Each structure stands twice: as C-alpha cells, then as structure tokens.
A protein has these predicted regions:
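SDR active-site lid
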Residues: 80-146
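Active-site-adjacent segment of SDR/Rossmann-fold oxidoreductases
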Residues: 52, 73-83
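Active-site loop immediately N-terminal to the catalytic Tyr-X3-Lys motif
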Residues: 5, 52-58, 62
Length: 172
C-alpha cells in the first residue's frame, strides 16, 4: 500500500505474477477440460479494488482491474461452451489480509485497514459467494450495505464524475 510515485516497479511485477498470471495460468490449464465436457463454471476472487479507484492502491488495483478485464472477455468467449464465469469482488471482509500487504519497497506493510476489523464476517461472505456461484451470477460485490465500498461501486458505475469528486475528498 503506497502511492505510485513511491512504489518500486518490482512490486507491480510481484503482484501481477502472484495475483494475475497465476490465475490466468490456472484458468488456461482447466479450461480445456471444461470445453471437452461441454460445461463448467469458473469462479474467481477479485476485489472491489478492481471496480473502483482508490489512492495508495495503484499496484493492487491494476492487478484486480486486469482480472476483471480478462474474465469479462473470457466470459464472452466461453459462453458457447456452456461455461459460466463468476467474479467475486469482496469489499470489507474481516480477514488477516493486512498482514500480507506490501509497502512501496515490497516489504510487509503490517497495518490493518478498517475493513479487516469492521467488515462482513467471513461466514456471511461465504454464503453470498456460494449463492452467486449456484445462481451463476456474472459478478457479486461482497460488502455491507452501509459500506462505503459498495456505495462507491454503485456511484462509480452510474455517476463516475461524482465518484471521483467524492473520492478526492474521502480518505480511504
């Protein structure tokens, strides 16, 4: 977690390899089996950070936006094979994710954010995820209704200028 100007480019490479290319490679390995079967369902975890911009998340958000672009394109390609694609975009969920965040030099950041303390419980998030997969939803945002992240996704989708106006004023 850091501003782009302070972030070593190696952090981008590390995150792309870990959070993007590993998912693409795994999908490539599994897709042929699904095509041969004539059906399947790909469900992958992304993030609200792949749907809305946030300061100090340039590296992380770019990876998550890349995943959304990849899977949205893939969805169009595999529909003809009866293969569904579900993107799971968590907002604030109580996790230990902050223990693994990296700073500008690629070292552990070591600071939890509000979502890790006050977000949705993992059990409740799992129920939403399982329901989305069962019903072959295109995408699900996992977040409390009161969560700014959910509201941010909504505002950004329908009122992008308003989103950036507000985002400049809110310290996220």
């Amino acid at each position: 977690q850091s501003y782009f100007e302070d972030t070593d480019i190696s952090v981008f490479h590390e995150l792309m390899n870990l959070d993007y290319f590993s998912v693409v490679y795994f999908t490539k390995a599994m897709l042929n089996h699904m095509v041969k079967e004539g059906s399947g369902h790909i469900a992958t975890n992304t993030s609200v950070a792949g749907l809305i911009a946030s300061r100090e998340r340039t590296a992380y958000s770019s990876v998550k936006f890349a995943l959304h672009g990849f899977f949205d394109s893939l969805r169009l390609e595999v529909m003809k094979h009866n293969i569904a694609v579900t993107l799971i975009a968590p907002g604030k969920v109580v996790t230990n994710f902050g223990d693994n965040k990296l700073d500008a030099q690629g070292k552990p950041f070591g600071e939890k954010n509000m979502g890790e303390a006050y977000g949705m419980s993992p059990a409740k998030a799992a129920k939403f995820i399982l329901s989305a997969i069962k019903h072959k939803k295109r995408q699900i945002v996992i977040s409390k209704w009161s969560d700014v992240a959910w509201l941010g996704v909504f505002i950004n989708k329908f009122f992008p200028s308003l989103y950036f106006f507000l985002a400049r004023r809110i310290n996220t």
